[in-house]
């Protein structure tokens, strides 16, 4: 059964490594050393819920509800455009240190709300956990399925805590004005690229619904 664990771990790691809204947010919180371990835990727990739902039967709900998928997609587009705009606005600020200080004033609950948004309003999360993992893990018998799910969940916990701790460790180098400007530009551009990609997918979904 351990082979199913490592299959799940490898697949989970491959899907979580690319830079996306979750990773960017965890990295930034690590650099700021602001509730970064709490955010890593909440991201990992969110993945635990989504992965479990996808592998143990939740994928059928999403696949049978095209309107739900469309709603999640366009909600994600709107949020990613807003999030990317905020990052680019900070990067282009004439006083980046002041802009960064304003971000640091955010309270715990606002940070948690943002974390929930970057996780649960990201349609790619549902496609990864419900469609990809659900289709692969759903074909397995119950015992291998549990090991497969445990492997993917382990990859999520290891990645988010590793990313948060590494970003916090590198914080002295990554908190410079130049580094912060580069990071915010990178995050903003990536968020907008993902948003435009999702918008194209959303248009395709809407055309399929009305045809």
From Swiss-Prot:
- What stretches pass through the bilayer? 1-21, 37-57, 68-88, 111-131, 147-167, 179-199
Q: Which domain of life is it from?
A: Bacteria
**InterPro entries the UniProt entry points to:** Arg_export_ArgO_enterobac, LeuE-type, Lys/arg_exporter
One short Pfam name that applies is LysE
Chief site of localization: membrane
State the reactions this protein catalyses.
L-arginine(in) = L-arginine(out)
CC annotations in GO: plasma membrane
Q: Does the keyword Protein transport apply?
A: no
What Gene Ontology molecular-function terms does this entry list? L-arginine transmembrane transporter activity
Q: Which UniProt keywords apply?
A: Amino-acid transport, Cell inner membrane, Cell membrane, Membrane, Transmembrane, Transmembrane helix, Transport
Compartment annotation: Cell inner membrane
Does the entry feature the keyword Cytoplasm, yes or no?
A: no
Its placement in the membrane is given as: Multi-pass membrane protein
What protein family is recorded?
Belongs to the LysE/ArgO transporter (TC 2.A.75) family.
UniProt function note: Involved in the export of arginine. Important to control the intracellular level of arginine and the correct balance between arginine and lysine.
Which protein, by its recorded name, is this?
Arginine exporter protein ArgO
Question: Source taxonomy lineage?
Answer: Bacteria, Pseudomonadati, Pseudomonadota, Gammaproteobacteria, Enterobacterales
